[in-house]
C-alpha cells in the first residue's frame, strides 16, 4: 500500500477525507468473527414462524374486518408491501450500522406490527390491521436478507442460501401447534392468539439478532462488484414464481373456508404450504452448487405454473396440492435466482435492494389478484 503524504496543517474551512476508498465503510458493530450459517438459519426460522401465522391470519382478518369485499386481501397485500418497502433500508442499513443492528431493527418492527394487529382484532379496526400487517411485512423484508448475508459470506452461494431457508422448515412444522395453542389462550377473540404469536416469534428473532457475530473488520481489497444488469433476469424469473405463489397463497384461506374447512384448521393447511416452501432447501443445501442456477430457477417456475390452475378446481385436495406446488416452486426459484445473481461477482447493496424489492413488488401484484382464485 502506498504511504500517504503528510497531512497539511489544519485551517478553517479545510475538508479532509478520512476514508480510504479501497476500504469498506466501517460498521458500528465491527468485530473479528465470521458469521455462521447456523445462527442466520435460527434467526430466519423465528421470522418464518411469524410469517406462517401471519400469512394464515391476515386473509381471515381481512374477511372479518374489511368494509367491502374487494378489500379482503388488503391486509395480506400490506404484508407484502411492507416487505418491499423494507428492501432498501434493510440493504443499506447493514453497511451503515452492521448486520446485528439491521436484523434487530427489523425484528423490532415485527414486534410492533404483531402488537398492533392484536389491538386491531380486539377493536375491530380494519385500518389498524393493515398497518400492523405492513409492519409485519417490513420485518419479513429484513429477514429475507439473512440469505444474502449467508451467500455473501460463503464460497457456495446456492448451498448457503438453501441452508438458511432450510431453517424455516422446523418453524413451519411447529407453526400449527403453536398457533392452535395461542388461539386457545386468546379465546374467544379469533386470531388474536395468532397475532400475539407473531409478535413473540419476532421477539425471539430479536434475541438471536443481537447475539450474531460482529461484522468483520474492514480489509484492504479492490472494489469488484457485479454489474447492476446482472440482477435483471434472475429478478424476472424468480418474480414469476413469487407472483404465482402469492396469488395462490392470498386466496387459499378463503377458498378453504368456502370448502367447509374450519378457521382453526386453515393454519394446518398454511403450515403445510410453508413447509413446502422450505423443504426443498434441504437437498439444495447439499447439492445446489452442482446444478446451474438458471436450471434451478426455471424448475421452480414450472412447479408454480403447475400449482396455480389447481386452485381453480376448488376442492380441499386440489387447493392443498396447489399450496404444495407453489410453495416448493417458490423455494427452488428463490435459491436458483439468489445463486444466479452471485455468478458475476459480489452484487452491490443497490442491486440486492432492487432484486428483493422487485420480487416483493410482483408478490404484491399476485396477492391483489388472489381473490380471483378464492
Predicted regions and their residues:
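C-terminal membrane-cytosol helix-exit motif in multi-pass small-molecule transporters
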Residues: 179-181, 199-218
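C-terminal ends and interior cores of transmembrane alpha-helices
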Residues: 108-123, 303-314
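Hydrophobic core of transmembrane alpha-helices in multi-pass small-molecule transporters
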Residues: 45, 126-143, 318-332
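Helix-loop boundary and gating motifs at the non-cytosolic
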Residues: 27-80, 233-237, 246-266
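Helix-to-loop junctions at the C-terminal end of transmembrane segments
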Residues: 86-99, 183, 279-292
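A late C-terminal transmembrane helix in Major Facilitator Superfamily
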Residues: 347-374
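Cytoplasmic helix-loop-helix junction between adjacent transmembrane helices
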Residues: 132-166
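Intracellular juxtamembrane helix-capping segments at the cytosolic ends
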Residues: 58, 140-154, 332-345
Amino acid at each position: 500500500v502506498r504511504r500517504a503524504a503528510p497531512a497539511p496543517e489544519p485551517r478553517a474551512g479545510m475538508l479532509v477525507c478520512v476514508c480510504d476508498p479501497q476500504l469498506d465503510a466501517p460498521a458500528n458493530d465491527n468485530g473479528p468473527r465470521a458469521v455462521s450459517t447456523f445462527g442466520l438459519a435460527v434467526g430466519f426460522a423465528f421470522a418464518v414462524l411469524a410469517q406462517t401465522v401471519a400469512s394464515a391470519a391476515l386473509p381471515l382478518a381481512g374477511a372479518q374486518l374489511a368494509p367491502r369485499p374487494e378489500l379482503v386481501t388488503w391486509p395480506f397485500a400490506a404484508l407484502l408491501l411492507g416487505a418491499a418497502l423494507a428492501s432498501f433500508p434493510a440493504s443499506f442499513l447493514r453497511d451503515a450500522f452492521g448486520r446485528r443492528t439491521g436484523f434487530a431493527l427489523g425484528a423490532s418492527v415485527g414486534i410492533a406490527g404483531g402488537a398492533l394487529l392484536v389491538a386491531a382484532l380486539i377493536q375491530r379496526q380494519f385500518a389498524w390491521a393493515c398497518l400492523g400487517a405492513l409492519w409485519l411485512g417490513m420485518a419479513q423484508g429484513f429477514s429475507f436478507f439473512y440469505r444474502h448475508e449467508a451467500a455473501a459470506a460463503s464460497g457456495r452461494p446456492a448451498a448457503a442460501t438453501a441452508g438458511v431457508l432450510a431453517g424455516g422448515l422446523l418453524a413451519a412444522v411447529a407453526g400449527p401447534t403453536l398457533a392452535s395453542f395461542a388461539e386457545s389462550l386468546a379465546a374467544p377473540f379469533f386470531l388474536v392468539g395468532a397475532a400475539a404469536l407473531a409478535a413473540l416469534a419476532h421477539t425471539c428473532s430479536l434475541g438471536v439478532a443481537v447475539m450474531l457475530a460482529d461484522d468483520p473488520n474492514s480489509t484492504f481489497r479492490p472494489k469488484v462488484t457485479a454489474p447492476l444488469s446482472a440482477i435483471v433476469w434472475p429478478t424476472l424469473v424468480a418474480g414469476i414464481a413469487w407472483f404465482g405463489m402469492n396469488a395462490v397463497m392470498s386466496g387459499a384461506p378463503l377458498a378453504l373456508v368456502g370448502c367447509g374447512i374450519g378457521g382453526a384448521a386453515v393454519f394446518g393447511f398454511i403450515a403445510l404450504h410453508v413447509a413446502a416452501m422450505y423443504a426443498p432447501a434441504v437437498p439444495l443445501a447439499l447439492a445446489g452448487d452442482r446444478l446451474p442456477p438458471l436450471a434451478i430457477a426455471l424448475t421452480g417456475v414450472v412447479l408454480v405454473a403447475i400449482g396455480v390452475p389447481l386452485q381453480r378446481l376448488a376442492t380441499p385436495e386440489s387447493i392443498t396440492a396447489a399450496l404444495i406446488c407453489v410453495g416448493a416452486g417458490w423455494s427452488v426459484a428463490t435459491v436458483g435466482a439468489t445463486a444466479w445473481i452471485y455468478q458475476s461477482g459480489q452484487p452491490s447493496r443497490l442491486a440486492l435492494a432492487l432484486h428483493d424489492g422487485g420480487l416483493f413488488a410482483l408478490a404484491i401484484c399476485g396477492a391483489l389478484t388472489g381473490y380471483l382464485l378464492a
